[in-house]
């Protein structure tokens, strides 16, 4: 089992939460092929609305990747983004600013957001535990 942070706007993350999937990098398949069933995924939302610059900068969802491979979904306008099924846990959003000095991938870094630009970032167990605790996630972490 691995842990990763996936990047998606909060409005896109909300659709995934409601329908039980994750999609990243505006629907690209490559990042989703790097995660496996059983992996824990946290969604980091730099913005509330895709295409805006509202500066949300929050973790907005937390869950476990389910069995199966990435697949293409259907959206309006003929857009067919790649998705992966996730069982989402009850969790509250938390701003990354509250955690930045405690997470190994952001602590002490002036350009802390750079590793997140690729849409998916593997993180250590300790980092995911910090994120889950801050989100008040009651799911059995590591189970």
Question: What kind of feature is each model-predicted range?
Answer:
Residues 32-35, 51-57:
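Short, conserved, surface-exposed binding loops centered on an aromatic residue
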Residues 26-29, 45, 69-72:
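Short acidic (Asp/Glu) patches
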Residues 12, 49, 71:
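Surface-exposed, flexible loop/turn segments at secondary-structure boundaries
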Residues 55-121, 125:
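Aromatic- and Lys/Arg-enriched surface recognition patch
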Residues 1-37, 130, 135-143:
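Compositionally biased, charged N-terminal/linker segments
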Residues 45-51:
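Short, charged beta-turn/beta-strand-edge "cap" motif at the junction between a beta-strand
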Residues 7-8, 45, 88-90:
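Pocket-edge structural micro-motifs
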């Amino acid at each position: 089992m691995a842990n990763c942070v996936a990047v998606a706007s909060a409005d896109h993350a909300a659709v995934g939460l409601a329908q039980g999937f994750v999609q990243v990098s505006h629907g690209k398949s490559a990042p989703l092929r790097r995660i496996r069933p059983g992996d824990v995924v946290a969604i980091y939302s730099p913005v509330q609305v895709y295409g805006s610059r509202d500066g949300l900068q929050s973790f907005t969802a937390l869950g476990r990747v389910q069995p199966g491979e990435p697949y293409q979904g259907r959206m309006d306008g003929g857009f067919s983004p790649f998705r992966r099924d996730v069982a989402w846990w009850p969790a509250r959003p938390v701003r990354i600013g509250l955690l930045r000095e405690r997470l190994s991938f952001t602590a002490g870094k002036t350009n802390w957001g750079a590793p997140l630009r690729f849409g998916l970032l593997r993180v250590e167990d300790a980092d995911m535990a910090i994120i889950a605790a801050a989100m008040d996630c009651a799911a059995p972490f590591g189970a």
